[in-house]
C-alpha cells in the first residue's frame, strides 16, 4: 500500500521546496528555452518535454494548499516563488523569440491565445488529480501528467513571443490562459485539500500548530 504524506508532513515538504534557488531557476530557464523552441518549430513532443522539466506547478500547488489550511507563511512563499518564476519565464522567452530567425506564428503558438471552457475543465480536473498525486510519498506519474495536461509552460512562452514581436493579442491572450490555468488549479487544490483533511477547518488548523 502506497504511503501518503500527512497534512503536517506535506506542509513541511512545501516549506522546503518553495524557495528561489539558483538550481531551480536554471532548470526553469532550460524548460522555457526548450518550450520556446518547440513552439517556434511547431513540435508537440518538444513542448511536452519542456512541461515535464518545468517547476512552475509547485508554487501554484503551494498557494492552493496554503489557502486551504490558512497558512500565511506558505501563501507568501508560494507567491514569491510564482512571481519570480513568471518574470524569469517571460524574460527568457522574450529574449529567445527576439533573436529567433523564425518570426512567424506557428499553430502551437496560435493555440495558446484563445482560452476556452475546455481549458477551465482541464485545469480543474488536473488540479484535483494533482492533489491526490502530490500527497503520495512514492514516485508516481500523476503529477507529471498534470503538468502536461494543464500546460503552464506554453502560454508563458507565447506571451514572450507576443512581447518580442509587439503582438498584443498574443501577449494578453496567452497571459489570460496562464491565469485561468493557475486560478483553477489552485481552486481545485483548495477543495481537494479540504476534502482530504476530513475534519473541520478549526480542528485541522489546531492540528497544524
Regions found by a protein language model. Give the residues of each.
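Transmembrane alpha-helical segments of integral membrane proteins
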Residues: 63-64, 157-160, 190-198
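Hydrophobic alpha-helical segments
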Residues: 113-186, 190
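Cytoplasmic membrane-interface regions of multi-pass membrane proteins
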Residues: 67, 72-73, 138, 195-203
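Juxtamembrane/interface motifs at transmembrane-helix termini
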Residues: 67-70, 80, 95-98, 164-165, ...
Amino acid at each position: 500500500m502506497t504511503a501518503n504524506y500527512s497534512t503536517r508532513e506535506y506542509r513541511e515538504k512545501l516549506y522546503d521546496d518553495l524557495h528561489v534557488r539558483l538550481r531551480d531557476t536554471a532548470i526553469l530557464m532550460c524548460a522555457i528555452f526548450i518550450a520556446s523552441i518547440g513552439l517556434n518549430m511547431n513540435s508537440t513532443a518538444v513542448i511536452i518535454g519542456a512541461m515535464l522539466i518545468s517547476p512552475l506547478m509547485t508554487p501554484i500547488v503551494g498557494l492552493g494548499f496554503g489557502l486551504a489550511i490558512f497558512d500565511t507563511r506558505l501563501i507568501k512563499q508560494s507567491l514569491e516563488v510564482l512571481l519570480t518564476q513568471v518574470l524569469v519565464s517571460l524574460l527568457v522567452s522574450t529574449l529567445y523569440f527576439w533573436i529567433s530567425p523564425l518570426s512567424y506564428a506557428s499553430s502551437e503558438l496560435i493555440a495558446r491565445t484563445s482560452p476556452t471552457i475546455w481549458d477551465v475543465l482541464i485545469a480543474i480536473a488536473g488540479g484535483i488529480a494533482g492533489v491526490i498525486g502530490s500527497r503520495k510519498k512514492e514516485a508516481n506519474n500523476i503529477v507529471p501528467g498534470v503538468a502536461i495536461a494543464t500546460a503552464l509552460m506554453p502560454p508563458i512562452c507565447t506571451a514572450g513571443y507576443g512581447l518580442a514581436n509587439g503582438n498584443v493579442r498574443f501577449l494578453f491572450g496567452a497571459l489570460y490562459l496562464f491565469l485561468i490555468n493557475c486560478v483553477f488549479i489552485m481552486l481545485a487544490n483548495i477543495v481537494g485539500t479540504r476534502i482530504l483533511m476530513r475534519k473541520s477547518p478549526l480542528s485541522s488548523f489546531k492540528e497544524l500548530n
